[in-house]
Amino acid sequence: MNDLYDNFGRIQKNDPEFHEIFKRFAFNEVYEYSTLTQKESVLVTLASLIACQSPKAFKKILLSSVNKYVTPEEVKELLYQSVPYVGFGRAHNFFGVVIKVFDKKGIDLPLENRSNTTSEDRRQKGREIQDKYFGAEMIQAMNDNTPEGQKHFNTFLEGFCFGDFYTRDGLNDKQRELITFVFIATFGGCENQLRGHTQGNLSVGNTKEKLVSAITIVLPYIGFPRSLNALSIINEICE
């Protein structure tokens, strides 16, 4: 997928040596060991760049991929999905990047509303998603074992994280859990959450091979230490 590197011309001009090394690895070699579709590869790449806080690289990849490998609606949902995991403080700049790229590409905004919940049913529908992904017994046990004074975090997970975002149209369950896995893997230091979302990926039908492929694709952006940590957790959960 060399075309994804088309907008990195400044590096090519000013540091052709690094340009050749990185292009060969990130846009050729890693793809030889991945079974992801082109769409999935772009989604996980964009997800990792959000979590890496790399808006310039995100913009360049988005310019090359929107309306070719991913739709504007999928990009919007990717960005929405990032908020409960990376936080709006980290996601904020990427909203501006997406607006600028869409404007340059002639994509009219705002896009169609994709919400499927109301203020009355968002918690119920969010809990249904939690139960589906992680098992009703596990979610209930988590709620029961949460100390007093902290149970509102479970309420936030039900309503905000899962109710407001996971229920939306635009990305399917497999895509949402895959990019969520990448958000968390990119961060590093969130091993318990990564374990949970490794299991969540398996529950919605993503395979161990797909998770390994996702880490393979994002390795050039997140580095070896975090990639190897993620592989260790994949192997632990999938053994």
Where in the sequence are the language-model features?
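Acidic, glycine/proline-rich low-complexity segments that act as flexible tails and inter-domain linkers
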Residues: 1-39, 52, 56-59, 63, ...
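Helix N-cap / loop-to-helix initiation motif
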Residues: 37, 70-74, 172, 205-209
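Short, structured motif recognition centered on aromatic/hydrophobic residues
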Residues: 41-49, 78-79, 176-185, 194, ...
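Alpha-helical bundle segments that constitute or directly flank the non-heme di-iron/ferroxidase center
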Residues: 45-56, 189
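A short structural micro-motif
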Residues: 50, 68, 81-88, 185, ...
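Hydrophobic/aromatic-rich structural module bridging two neighboring secondary-structure elements via a short loop
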Residues: 61-97
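Short, glycine/charged-rich beta-strand-loop motifs at protein surfaces that mediate ligand recognition
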Residues: 169, 182-188, 201
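Extended hydrophobic/aromatic segments used for targeting, binding, or gating
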Residues: 196-198, 204-218
